[in-house]
Amino acid sequence: MSNRSYTQEELADILKGMGVTDQTDVSRYGSGHINDTFKVETKRGVRFILQRINTDIFPDAEMLKDTVMRVTGHLRAKGVPSLEVIAYANPWRLYAFLDGYTSRDVVSEPRQAYDVARAFAKFQNDLADMPPPRLGEIIPKFHDTPDRMRQLDEAVKVNYKGRLANVAKEMAFVEAWRRNTSRLSDLMAAGKIPERITHNDTKINNVLVAADGTAVVIDLDTVMPGSALSDFGDMVRTSSAAAAEDEKDLSKVYSKIEYFEQLAKGYLEGAKFLNDCEKDNLVFSGKLATFEVGIRFLADYLKGDTYFHTAYEDHNLVRARTQFKMVESIEAQEAEYEAIVKKYRG
């Protein structure tokens, strides 16, 4: 979340420009780290979400607006519950508040893994028939793992405060894995894995659920063309993890097979559009997505912690080690994971 503070008067002026003048309370909302988000209460009893887009992360505000408006419009036209944009005044936007929905920050039981996988599979499926033009790439090369490797190689040259001396084991792991990093991009270039519209941030807290089980996928700022496998891989990384992303005790870090099974079951039940090559690479995508985030943390550590917020000196290194341990855990269970995919792939 941005450290920027706003007075009630400033927020009132912004809301006035969007047609809201009867607010009774405007307060910080949610646990996001990128945009500034506020919940707006009004005298009418109507609630809104007011959000300021972080233009450092999303410099092309018009492309972002076009993406969000097209995605939400397409979903709502099909009768699919979605965010409703009330007004835009870049870099600010106003959403209708989704009453009756709740979210979770942690997957605490296997059924929740199933639900999140079904929700994102349905999201991809619902956007599969979006008409041209092609959506813009909000963050170019976001899941281009070879390019992330290039960035790590550059970070090694920076070697902030001689930190490279602390990561010999991690760098050896990276080098052993380097040959795998272009696998999915090569398959896409060869036309074996198609480009699809993907979410690119498939954490459980980006799925809101109503009492009747209706799910709404939120945080649409990274929706853009990509591989469906990037979305599934990140679900494996986040929703099958036994420990937090920055757990220091690596003995607690592993991928839970019962959670992976529910992810695979839910995703394959909902993602009937997947071709055989995509299904063949579902387990690999979990490893690759986790490795990719690991090298991003490692690169940031070697550059002096310039991108990810850190709470202490070696925070990014701890995060990188956790991701690499997750990769090893998935590899250790790979035969079992592949058997699970075979069980549900149809």
Regions found by a protein language model. Give the residues of each.
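ATP-binding pocket architecture of kinase catalytic cores
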Residues: K43-L135
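Juxta-kinase regulatory segment immediately upstream of eukaryotic protein kinase catalytic domains
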Residues: M1-T24
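ATP-binding glycine-rich phosphate-binding loop
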Residues: T21-T42
